[in-house]
Amino acid sequence: ALPSSSAVNWAERFMGAGPELHGYTEWGSKTPELPSRVLNKNGIFPTVFQLLRDARPEAEIGCLYEWEGIKYLVDTLSLSYHYHVADCNKTPKELGNMASSYIKEKHPALIAICYDGPDHTGHTAGHDTPEYYEKLKELDVYVGQIVQAVKDAGMLDDTIFILTSDHGGIDKGDGGKTVQERETAFVRSG
């Protein structure tokens, strides 16, 4: 996706549209820089969260995240619960623990769990470095914890997992037009 920066690409993931429609064009956008082509009843471009809320008003819908910018892109008024981990470097296990508890207690119909640690590592140590791959191994443990919580909640047979990111990176940066910055993994299971 272009531009290969966080708010633009997370908006694309949650809204199912590109910047020419949702209007977010900058890394840290809190509001669209361009007028959104459509607004929902909450004054934001339609999101997957709002579409589910409209279809199933009673649904439990959550979003837990480490990067604070996520809250501007998910339509928090359509969520049942949202939680921001203030400092993922000081408490790297907090998001996985919170997500696991939330899943077991509330059995959400939809939950987004957004980790920021790999992005931080890419900017400090570099992308495609041993440190970056160590961070991904750490993240794999948290994904396993979340999968186990889904199993423990008795939801595994009805769950689809999607693992992706907002953008790639090159050296210690992102936001450019290279293939390494634009391409992301997209893994679906269930």
Predicted regions and their residues:
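Active-site His/acidic residue clusters
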Residues: E68-Y83, N97-V141, Q145
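Loop/turn elements at helix/coil->beta-strand transitions in domains of secreted/extracellular proteins
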Residues: V8, A55-G62, E105-I111, M155-F161, ...
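Active-site nucleophile/metal-coordination loop of metallo-enzymes that catalyze phosphate/sulfate
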Residues: A1-R56
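Second-shell loop/turn segments in exported
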Residues: A1, W10-A11, E33-N40, L51, ...
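Metal-dependent active-site segment of extracytoplasmic phospho-/sulfohydrolases and closely related
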Residues: E138-V179, F186
